[in-house]
Regions:
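Intrinsically disordered, low-complexity proline/glycine-rich segments
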Residues: 1-108
């Protein structure tokens, strides 16, 4: 089954004591590739800084997982895997929001 593609404005799960975060306007590496009117997200896109209730500093997560079969050419000319609901960030978050009409690759 295809996973719903992620876009600017979509959210992450949070992790441990760190709160959920979102992908801000401008966080997409593919500003010309849109889904439901929002730029799509790929591997290497970053979420907004998210803090913790502990004294730990805020961190910024980077998408490290994407569709094994769907790639998009980003603004820098590099083809990257399309990010989907359930894909991971290097901080421990997962993507939890995504497009309602477009999916890509299989999410295990």
């Amino acid at each position: 089954m295809a996973g719903s593609m992620a876009r600017e404005g979509d959210m992450t799960t949070g992790h441990g004591s760190y709160a959920p975060s979102k992908f801000a306007v401008g966080s997409s590496l593919c500003q010309k590739a849109t889904i439901e009117g929002k730029p799509m997200l790929t591997v290497d896109a970053k979420c907004e800084p998210h803090g913790s209730s502990s004294p730990s500093p805020a961190i910024i997560g980077t998408i490290i997982e994407g569709s094994p079969t769907s790639f998009v050419k980003c603004d820098d000319g590099v083809y990257r895997k399309v990010a989907r609901i359930g894909d991971s960030l290097d901080c421990g978050c997962k993507i939890v929001w995504g497009a309602k009409t477009v999916g890509a690759g299989a999410n295990a």
